[in-house]
Amino acid sequence: MREVATGVWHWKAAHPEWKPGQKWDRMVSSYAVDSGEGVLLFDPLDVPVELRERATAVVLTCPWHRRDAPQLGLPIHVPPPDPPDPDPVRGEVFRGGDTLPFGVRAFEGFEPNDLVLYVESRHAVVVGDTLIDRGNGLEVHREWPGPGVAAEEVVHRLRPLLDLPVDVVLPTHADPADRAALERALSL
C-alpha cells in the first residue's frame, strides 16, 4: 500500500476470478480516499488492516467489482445491477449524474452501470472498466463498451471531467495516473 496523494491510498491484489488468457491483468488496483467526511474504499480487494479500521463506506465503480465489499460490514454504494443478476450487491444504488452525500459525483462510462467517479475533496477520478492501460497509457477500452456504444460516445460522456480540477486518476485496471493521462485518454 502506498499513499499516492494526500489522503489517497493505492494497493494491488490478485483478482480471485482471473484465469490465464483473460484480456485483463491478474493484479487489480483498489483505492482508499479520505473524503474529509470519512475514508471511502473503492472497488476493495484485500484491504490493508490500517485502512479497513478507518473505512466508513465502500463505493463500487460497477456492480461486478464487488470484490470484498460485502464482507467488510460497511455501507455500500453501488451502481444498478446487470439484469438478471441472481445475487446483486446489496447497498445504496446510484447512477450516472448522481452526487453521493460525501462529495463523489458519478459519470456514466461505457455502460449505465460502469461509472467513472469524481471525488471533489481530493480532485481524484476513480475509474473501473471504462479506462484501462494495456501498455500504451490510459485509453477507452474499445472491446468492452456495450452494444451500440462507440468509444467516441464514451469520450463525449466523460469530457466534462476535463472541466474539473483533476490531480490524480485512479484506474482499477492500471496504476494511478495524472491529469495528463486523462486528457490523452479523452482526446480521440
Identify the residue ranges that each predicted region occupies.
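Metallo-beta-lactamase
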Residues: 2, 6, 13-16, 38-41, ...
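Short Pro/Gly-enriched beta-strand edge/turn motifs at strand-loop
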Residues: 8-20, 97-104
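Pre-active-site segment of Zn-dependent metallo-hydrolases
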Residues: 10, 16-57
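Active-site HxH/HxHxD metal-binding segment of metal-dependent hydrolases
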Residues: 21, 45-100
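A generic local structural motif
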Residues: 26-29, 44-50, 64-69, 112-114, ...
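Short glycine/proline-enriched coil/turn segments at helix->beta-strand junctions
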Residues: 36-37, 52-56, 72-75, 102, ...
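A contiguous pocket-lining binding segment that forms or flanks enzyme active sites
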Residues: 89-120
